[in-house]
From Swiss-Prot:
Keywords: PQQ biosynthesis. This is PqqA binding protein. Pathway: Cofactor biosynthesis; pyrroloquinoline quinone biosynthesis. Functions as a PqqA binding protein and presents PqqA to PqqE, in the pyrroloquinoline quinone (PQQ) biosynthetic pathway. It comes from the Bacteria. It holds the Pfam family PqqD. Monomer. Interacts with PqqE. Transmembrane segments: none annotated. One of its GO terms (biological process) is pyrroloquinoline quinone biosynthetic process. InterPro entries: PQQD (IPR008792), PqqD_bac (IPR022479), PqqD_sf (IPR041881). Disulfide bonds: none annotated.
Length: 103
């Protein structure tokens, strides 16, 4: 059986939550959580915004462009922070690389 697919996040990466993980709003606690088998992670508001943009189609560069435009912040600073955050989530098994669609 294959283990988790570890990724190295870069500007060209197209990250997505793996099938076993879901980003959901917990209405009882009024917080966003990432639910995975036997694991729960409560990301902060910024992480939630980044994760909502990570749909497997957008690259990390695209996500950074959107956030830099929205917050009128330097793109390179946003990109550095986004890569670091996503790499941390990937290292913990909460993120994977989107697979190419085959037809």
């Amino acid at each position: 059986m294959a283990g988790p697919r570890h990724i190295s996040v870069s500007e060209a990466s197209r990250p997505v939550l793996p099938r076993h993980a879901k980003l959901k709003y917990d209405e009882t606690r009024e917080v966003w959580v990432i639910l995975a088998p036997e694991r729960v992670l409560a990301p902060d508001e910024i992480a939630v915004e980044v994760l909502q943009l990570c749909n497997g189609e957008r690259s990390v560069g695209d996500v950074s462009d959107q956030l830099a435009a929205k917050y009128a912040a330097p793109r390179e600073a946003i990109l550095t922070d986004v890569i670091a955050m996503l790499q941390d989530l990937a290292d913990k098994g909460f993120l994977t690389e989107a697979r190419e669609k085959t037809s």
